[in-house]
Amino acid sequence: MDHGFYESNLDGEGLRIGIVQARFNEPVCDELREACMAELKKLGVEGEDTLLVTVPGALEVPLALQKMAESGQFDALVALGAVVRGETYHFELVSNESGAGITRVGLDFNVPIANGILTVDTDAQAHARTREKGRDCARAAVEMANLVVALDSLREHGAEDAEDEEDDE
């Protein structure tokens, strides 16, 4: 049996990307955003095809993503933030709940979400990861937006094939 293969597609032309950035740990989050926006531009996503909103912290990110997803105006979304471990259990709570919320929104609304919420032990670790993570999120958002379109077309072709089979009967 011969199997098909879908090449990853990093062409961002015409894609609409929504970005939700947490403001807590703002210098780190600003670096994430700058790297993400620069990479989106390199991939062909126009500035007017992006919408950036900011929220207080990582726990507020999922709700903003949900509202963007509900609008149906975005091909992909990006979550940006930084959770730095402190001396209390709060780190685990924020890390786990923000991640679970982001995943749930993507699955509930069938929209790709690149999760760029850094979870690190120190500010130095966060700063060391901002450029690469911001860039990677842009690439993941574009690639997954294109993949969803390609996979949705499989469903459309499957429906057409089923109709053709019914017509043949």
Curated annotation (Swiss-Prot):
Pathway: Cofactor biosynthesis; riboflavin biosynthesis; riboflavin from 2-hydroxy-3-oxobutyl phosphate and 5-amino-6-(D-ribitylamino)uracil: step 1/2. Its EC number is 2.5.1.78. GO terms for molecular function: 6,7-dimethyl-8-ribityllumazine synthase activity. It is an enzyme of class 2 (transferase). (2S)-2-hydroxy-3-oxobutyl phosphate binds at residues 87-88, 129. Pfam families: DMRL_synthase (PF00885). The active site is at residue 90. 5-amino-6-(D-ribitylamino)uracil binds at residues 24, 58-60, 82-84, 115. Gene3D superfamilies: Lumazine/riboflavin synthase. One of its GO terms (biological process) is riboflavin biosynthetic process. It catalyses: (2S)-2-hydroxy-3-oxobutyl phosphate + 5-amino-6-(D-ribitylamino)uracil = 6,7-dimethyl-8-(1-D-ribityl)lumazine + phosphate + 2 H2O + H(+). SUPFAM superfamilies: Lumazine synthase. Belongs to the DMRL synthase family. Catalyzes the formation of 6,7-dimethyl-8-ribityllumazine by condensation of 5-amino-6-(D-ribitylamino)uracil with 3,4-dihydroxy-2-butanone 4-phosphate. This is the penultimate step in the biosynthesis of riboflavin. This is 6,7-dimethyl-8-ribityllumazine synthase. The gene is ribH.
